[in-house]
Each structure stands twice: as structure tokens, then as C-alpha cells.
Design a protein with these regions (language model features):
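Short, positively charged and aromatic/hydrophobic N-terminal segments
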Residues: 9-10, 14, 20
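Small-molecule kinase domains that catalyze NTP-dependent phosphoryl transfer to phosphate-bearing small molecules
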Residues: 83-89, 168-213
Length: 227
């Protein structure tokens, strides 16, 4: 496996070269995913096949540089960083103290939203999570394919979690559930949409049966059908 950090570096350095080969008439792709389902690998495969830029954690790095926002702040309110943070903020929303801190997560999200809109204005991209489907639909208003990647076999998720993040075997299932809940809470907080609900996606793809390549091919099939 290529580590998460390595892919962030690869994507940041390859943006310019990949953009040259992109078909500007293609639609963008948004992938939401269960933790450990291989959604990132599916996005990588699509990026290689289509020559389209692929954005995940590197969005935070780019947003921080573009808008002068501390990377730590962006990470605190990112889908990987939230736990009880957004829940606590929601509970304090009607208090005087809460009103002073409530702006922080929305400032972080608005920075990501502005960046996503800038990126798709230059051409179609591939995005992982972070409510980018909401941004593309309500703000950028560009066409896109929206897929949810899941794995019905927990063992598949466990093996990927160990390989990618090095999670200890004794706590791995609890870790997987926590990461899913973080993504669910992030989506609900910023969009009021249900993360993983079939009605919010064009495709629901099971990598335990399709594999990463099969899931990527299914998304390519939808793109081809929309030409």
C-alpha cells in the first residue's frame, strides 16, 4: 500500500502534469466511503485512468496556503479530526460562549468550499468526502458522479486499516466504527444529509464483492453513459 501521506505528496506534485490530459467535458467524481473500504484506492485508480486530479487530505494543505488558515485548525474541524468536537459546539450554539467559537468550524469548511469551487472551475476533479458533493451541487453547481464505497466484509476493512494506518489489532474494530462516526457527524453537521444513505448517491459500491478495480469500472461506466 502507498501510505496516506505519500499520496498527498504525489497528488500535490502531479497536479499540473495531470491537468494537461484531462477531458474538460468530463464530470467530476465525489467518493464518500466507509473507513477501510478502499475508497481512496478506487479514487487513485480513477485518477490514473482519467488523468484527473485527486484531492483528499491535500485539500487541507492547499486551503491553508491559499487562505492563510492554520493547518491545525483545518485538521481540527476536518472529517478525520472531529469526534465530540462538533457535537459539543452544536450543544453550545445557543450560549454566549458558544456563539464565539461556532464560527471556527464554518470558517474551515468555507475555506474548503471556496477551494473546491476554484479547482472545478479549472476542470473536473476527483474528491474524497468532506461534503464535496454538497459543495458541487449547491455552490459550484457543476455536474458530477457521486458514489459511496463500502465493504460488506469486516475482515477486508480490518486488513486495510492495519495496512494503511497501522492500527493495532486489539482495538481495530472500535477504531473503524469511530472513523465512520466521524464522517457521519461531519456530514450531518455541515449539510444535514445522511452519510451513506442510498438516496444521496448515484452509486453504492461494495468493494468486498467488486474489488477496487471493479468499483472504479462501475464509476467509469456511469461517466461514459452521461457523455
Amino acid at each position: 500500500w502507498t501510505t496516506r501521506g505519500e499520496w498527498d505528496i504525489i497528488e500535490l506534485t502531479n497536479n499540473k502534469t495531470r491537468r494537461e490530459g484531462v477531458d474538460m467535458n468530463r464530470q467530476s467524481i465525489v467518493i464518500d466511503r466507509q473507513y477501510g473500504s478502499g475508497g481512496r484506492e478506487v479514487a487513485r485508480i480513477l485518477s490514473e485512468k482519467l488523468g484527473m486530479d485527486f484531492y483528499d487530505g491535500n485539500l487541507l494543505v492547499l486551503a491553508g496556503k491559499e487562505y492563510g488558515i492554520d493547518l491545525g485548525t483545518l485538521q481540527t474541524y476536518d472529517e478525520k479530526g472531529v469526534g465530540s468536537v462538533l457535537h459539543d459546539i452544536a450543544l453550545m450554539s445557543n450560549t454566549a460562549y458558544g456563539s464565539n467559537i461556532n464560527d471556527a468550524p464554518f470558517q474551515a469548511f468555507n475555506a474548503l468550499s471556496r477551494l473546491v469551487q476554484q479547482l472545478v472551475a479549472k476542470g473536473p476533479c476527483i474528491f474524497l468526502g468532506r461534503c464535496t458533493s454538497h459543495i458541487l451541487k449547491t455552490e459550484a453547481r457543476v455536474p458530477f458522479v457521486n458514489a459511496f464505497i463500502y465493504a460488506s466484509n469486516m475482515q477486508d476493512r480490518i486488513e486495510r486499516a492495519r495496512a494503511v494506518d497501522g492500527v493495532e489489532i486489539g482495538r481495530i474494530e472500535a477504531y473503524i466504527r469511530r472513523r465512520d462516526n466521524q464522517r457521519k457527524n461531519y456530514t450531518r453537521f455541515f449539510t444535514d444529509k445522511a452519510w451513506g444513505a442510498p438516496e444521496n448517491y448515484d452509486l453504492m459500491l461494495n468493494t468486498s464483492t467488486l474489488g477496487y478495480e471493479g468499483a472504479a469500472q462501475a464509476i467509469l461506466g456511469v461517466l461514459e453513459g452521461r457523455k
